Swiss-Prot record:
Pfam families: LRR_14, LRR_8. This is Leucine-rich repeat-containing protein 40. The gene is lrrc40. It comes from Danio rerio (Zebrafish). The keyword Repeat applies. GO terms for biological process: intracellular signal transduction. LRR repeats lie at residues 33-56, 79-101, 102-124, 125-148, 150-170, 171-193, 194-217, 219-239, 240-264, 266-285, 286-308, 309-334, 336-355, 397-420, 423-446, 447-469, 470-492, 493-516, 518-539, 540-563, 565-586. PROSITE patterns: LRR. Disulfide bonds: none annotated. The keyword Repeat applies. InterPro entries: Leu-rich_rpt (IPR001611), Leu-rich_rpt_typical-subtyp (IPR003591), LRR_dom_sf (IPR032675), LRR_domain-containing (IPR050216), LRR_R13L4/SHOC2-like (IPR055414). Keywords: Leucine-rich repeat, Repeat.
């Protein structure tokens, strides 16, 4: 007999009710379903689901009248609970409350119908793991859907949904979510609670941005945001370490996203945007990339750093404004497909372009060996060449305004690294992943142009006061160091927009941060911060992202709820009791609302 209790759903005549003779579902199908636990009614032109389907495991079947012997071969009373029900490609306009009469359902597929609503009782299907509702006319979902906490796969594509409530964050076991082809204008920050999500499709909506909290989805492998209205990608997207496929086609992007932590990214699709420039900073971390699609953009040239993509197999540059190619492109060992149609290439003969990728790469390789007037041959090292200079990309300094001396495991930055700047304006400095115990004093040489500095993954214990001379700084990354405080002189950084202090040794929130009104992002997770001053925090009127997760905060001040500029507030992993976890998983808006409700009146 079934393991599910049915008493609550059985009426007094259930045992004597006969299945209707005019049921549009063949009796043989129902009989087989009782044995197999599966029923496929797809493509049968149904305008409604017969009651006999919902009551499949409740009513006494017809064969009971014909055979009541316990010794019979057809043991009709030994039925299996229905676990899989397929109703796709019919003409259903509604699903009745009786759907709750199938509590053992694991798979429910109702795609390609005419549904405009669902009953709230769908939330009673506690065993449901896969719910397919695509290609219908749904404008919203009942609250019952968000009670399906065992759900692993939810398909809602091709509907008319305009908003997803923050209750989405309750579906913590989801590993696949498809919201494509709807009318969504934003996504709730509670999406970040879906820590098991592997595949997320948001394509073909009206999204202008992604919630910063999306960076917390550490298991996400595929993200599709194609055909939206996004002009930029939040920097925190770079923290998605498991991402393998990223689709950003048909948006309004002007630059490739910087993805320094996406070490496993294999496919990056950015076609049909407004990208004009490719910079070394966008390419150097994409070591695992096998496919880069940039067709139908406005790219004018390829940097020499394209050769950093040693795993690249396919490069699509169709319909851009490229007039020449770096000869180093021919040295990429795995490149099998290079699409260049629709570019004003003048330096390469047309007949060569028609011979295919292999011949073109062979030609480019042959040009690498030509004399320096081709601009490609490296200058030989001499006895006067310092070892550190051999590691510096001078081309990046001059053309990309980037000084990169990262991942060298050096305890100091040699002077000749700064000498290589040679008066050129530098906007980006990356000294991360070394063994630095102090900030190089010559960093102030770059004070007139430096906007972004990365000193993460070192052994810094202090930040010098003369850091305040870097008046153009907009972004500081100090993650994974040994810092316990910041100097008050940093309040002079009037252009600073983001600071990353995660994985240090702060025991209190740095007082100076309250005095930098330009701040938009503060990430100080995984420290030992014991509390925050909500009144001072409110003075940061531009602050939109505040990550305080994994600290020692015992009490969250209710006044923090008045920081209405916050769009992403991360508090998980702290020892406080309130707000409770049930509030936290609902997202930033719910947390702020809860905190405001606790303010004494």
């Amino acid at each position: 007999m079934s393991r599910f209790k049915r008493g609550a759903h059985v009426d007094s005549g259930a045992g004597f009710r006969q299945e209707k003779e005019d049921c549009p579902v063949p009796y043989g199908l129902l009989k087989a379903a009782r044995k197999s636990g599966q029923l496929n009614l797809s493509g049968r032109g149904l305008t409604e689901v017969p009651a006999s389907v919902w009551r499949l495991n409740l009513d006494t079947p017809q064969e009971a009248k014909q055979n009541v012997s316990f010794g019979a071969e057809d043991r009709w009373w030994e039925q299996t609970d229905l676990t899989k029900l397929l109703l796709s490609s019919n003409k259903l306009q509604s699903i009745p409350d009786d759907v709750k009469l199938l509590p053992a359902l694991v798979v429910l597929d109702i795609h390609d119908n005419q549904l405009s609503s669902l009953p709230d009782s769908i939330g009673d299907l506690e065993q449901l793991q896969k719910l397919i509702l695509s290609h219908n006319k749904l404008t919203e979902l009942p609250s019952g859907v968000w009670r399906l906490t065992n759900l692993r796969c939810l398909h809602l594509q091709q509907n008319l949904i305009e908003q997803i409530p923050r209750d989405l964050g309750q579906l913590v076991n989801l590993d696949e979510l498809d919201l494509s082809n709807n009318h969504l204008i934003d996504i709730p920050e509670s999406l970040a609670n879906l820590q098991n999500l592997v595949k997320l499709d948001l394509s073909c909506n009206k999204l202008k941005s992604l919630p910063p909290a999306i960076s917390q989805m550490k298991n996400l492998r595929m993200l599709d945001c194609s055909r939206n209205q996004m002009e930029s990608i939040p920097p925190v997207l770079a923290q998605m370490e498991s991402l393998e496929q990223l689709y950003l086609r048909h948006n309004k992007l002007r630059y490739l996203p910087e993805l320094p932590c996406c070490k496993t990214l294999k496919e990056l699709h950015c076609g049909n945007n407004q990208i004009e420039v490719l910079e070394a900073e966008h390419l150097k971390h994409l070591n695992a990339l096998s496919l880069l699609e940039l067709r139908d953009n406005k790219v004018k040239s390829l940097p020499e750093e394209i050769t950093l993509l040693q795993g690249l197999e396919r490069l699509d540059l169709t319909n851009n404004d490229i007039s020449s190619l770096p000869c180093g492109l021919g040295t990429l060992p795995k490149l099998k497909s290079l699409s260049l149609e629709g570019n004003p290439l003048r330096a390469i003969r047309r007949d060569l372009l028609t011979k295919g990728t292999g011949e073109l790469l062979k030609y480019l390789r042959s040009r690498v060996q030509e004399p320096p007037n081709g601009g490609l041959k490296e200058e030989p090292k001499t006895a006067m060449t310092f070892p550190s200079q051999a590691k510096i990309n001078v081309h990046a300094i001059k053309t990309l305004k980037t000084l990169d001396y990262s991942e060298k495991q050096d305890a100091t930055i040699p002077d000749d690294v700064f000498d290589a700047v040679d008066g050129n304006p530098v906007a980006n400095v990356n000294f991360s992943k070394n063994q630095l115990t102090a900030v190089p004093h010559r960093i102030v040489d770059l004070k007139d142009s430096l906007a972004d500095i990365n000193l993460g993954f070192n052994k810094l214990t202090t930040i010098p006061a003369d850091f305040c001379h870097l008046k153009q700084l907009m972004h500081i990354d100090l993650r994974n160091n040994l810092l316990i405080s910041l100097p008050m002189e940093l309040e002079g950084l009037i252009k600073l927009r983001s600071v990353i202090l995660s994985f240090n040794r702060f025991k209190s929130f740095p007082e100076v941060l309250y005095r930098i009104p330009s701040l938009e992002t503060i990430l100080i997770s995984s420290n030992q911060v014991g509390g925050i001053d909500a009144v001072q925090m409110k003075t940061l009127s531009r602050l939109s992202t505040l990550d305080l997760s994994n600290n020692d905060i015992m009490q969250v001040p209710p006044e923090l709820g008045n920081c209405t500029s916050l769009r992403a507030l991360m508090l998980d992993g702290n020892p406080f009791r309130n707000p409770r976890a049930a509030i936290l998983i609902k997202g930033t808006d719910a947390v702020l609302e809860y905190l405001r409700s606790r303010i004494p009146t």
